[in-house]
Amino acid sequence: MSWFQKLMPSRIRTDASERSRSVPEGLWTKCGHCSAVLYRPELERNQEVCPKCGDHMRIGARRRLAGFLDAEGQVEIGADVQPVDALRFRDSKKYRDRLAQAQKGTGERDALVAMQGRLRGMPVVAVAFEFSFMGGSMGSVVGERFVRAADTAREQRVPLVCFSASGGARMQEGLFSLMQMAKTSAALARLSEEGVPFVSVLTDPTMGGVSASLAMLGDLVVAEPGALIGFAGPRVIEQTVRETLPEGFQRAEFLLEHGAIDQIIDRREMADRLHRILAMLTHQPAAEAADAPEAGEQPSEATDPVGEHWD
């Protein structure tokens, strides 16, 4: 107890202690970019985008899809597919133990969630990586769920949207994991042959085998602001080439400037913007856009030189 607290009457000390205990844990959080203290419910309403600086924080797969798709009519694809330890792999820990830990921590069976639903009334199939599940790494289950989602989109002739957030292929599955790069790419080739649109949304981070396969195969490739996108990480590249990388290297803005992606879209505008784009690509009428971002929010047009073309 501090000297100031000792001088306080006991009743005041008790009241202050009770007020402190009445504040729920996790009610406040801190922005890792601008260090602003944020009210957690407000941050959740803002889709995990800092209302002070616009930093796009990482968000879980189900929360992302819930904010992207219409609330009604969502049907999960491939929920029955479960991972197995076919190689009985072990590094510092058994693979099956890592799976159990990730499943307990996230509530997911693996690192990809696939949903069939509607986007502003338009039928779509959407998939999202769960980065909290072993770094969103792509193994057999991720590949199988993605292929099922792509096949569903192809059979029903509805657009496919993928939100990538992955460190790459899952090393614990060896060649089974690497094969998913070819497997998912082949599924997207079949989708393309049928003329069904595929939009790839790159979020922070999209790296390794995922960036080298499905993530870059979209008819439209967009990214969230500030997303780290590449194959090897910047530290690995610097150690290999022994040179200092340019500022912002591998960030979404750098890739847009150099023509590697098509647009940068604010997460809060993602559903409306992609709905309008997909309506144009599928020759459907677009529903009215939702309200514009509130004052102080950063619209994506500031980093989107081709936005007018798609709008």
Curated annotation (Swiss-Prot):
Gene3D superfamilies: 2-enoyl-CoA Hydratase, Chain A, domain 1
GO molecular function: acetyl-CoA carboxylase activity; ATP binding; carboxyl- or carbamoyltransferase activity; zinc ion binding
InterPro entries listed in its UniProt record: AcCoA_carboxyl_beta, Acetyl_CoA_COase_Trfase_b_su, ClpP/crotonase-like_dom_sf, COA_CT_N, Znf-ACC
Keywords: ATP-binding, Cytoplasm, Fatty acid biosynthesis, Fatty acid metabolism, Lipid biosynthesis, Lipid metabolism, Metal-binding, Nucleotide-binding, Transferase, Zinc, Zinc-finger
Listed PROSITE patterns: COA_CT_NTER
Membrane spanning stretches: none
Location of the protein in the cell: Cytoplasm
The protein's assembly and partners: Acetyl-CoA carboxylase is a heterohexamer composed of biotin carboxyl carrier protein (AccB), biotin carboxylase (AccC) and two subunits each of ACCase subunit alpha (AccA) and ACCase subunit beta (AccD).
Annotated protein name in UniProt: Acetyl-coenzyme A carboxylase carboxyl transferase subunit beta
Native organism taxonomy: Bacteria, Pseudomonadati, Pseudomonadota, Gammaproteobacteria, Chromatiales
